[in-house]
From Swiss-Prot:
This is Thermostable monoacylglycerol lipase. It comes from Bacillus sp. (strain H-257). Monomer. Changing D196N: Loss of enzyme activity. PANTHER family: PHOSPHOLIPASE-RELATED. This lipase is not secreted extracellularly as other bacterial lipases.
Amino acid sequence: MSEQYPVLSGAEPFYAENGPVGVLLVHGFTGTPHSMRPLAEAYAKAGYTVCLPRLKGHGTHYEDMERTTFHDWVASVEEGYGWLKQRCQTIFVTGLSMGGTLTLYLAEHHPDICGIVPINAAVDIPAIAAGMTGGGELPRYLDSIGSDLKNPDVKELAYEKTPTASLLQLARLMAQTKAKLDRIVCPALIFVSDEDHVVPPGNADIIFQGISSTEKEIVRLRNSYHVATLDYDQPMIIERSLEFFAKHAG
């Protein structure tokens, strides 16, 4: 799938080559690397080799996204993982929202991943399933899900429309990921916002109970909505994830 539109300013991927420990960061559905950039820069500053790709069909125009499948998004993440594998002995993966879903998906297929940090990750959004099976013809595009932030001074760089076809792809990705959670054995630090208007917070419990990891923890974010990586709890997410990397990097 070739994209027809230019990349939006601020939606560019981010790479930093540093030490032998790498971190792959994955942004969310309809979003861009912008939502994960503060974390990527903090990890790079701490000496980690960092890869923050732009998912296929994202960060350009929602018509580009409409032409992609979840396999394209997986391929974008696999490519980033491969880039890190060439440079690093140890790799962690973190992601926001669908980026968290892709984090879980990757851990299901790559048991050598050292640890994962899903942030408001999605494996079950009943509203999507209800919308798809509710009967009647759905519009081609729905309103944006972006910028669910408690901080009124911050805006997420994301599409103003959501392609209905892409929601179906997200539903398929979530279903496949949820079905194989028990394959995950690496340490997991699971962040969840108490108030999230996009992904029900109960997803964190589904993930926690579903994965086979012996080392796993849920950290509740009291002062952020869905896009927690840009919200009030951002410093805490950075601090706790850096502690997690240091602990498990050996």
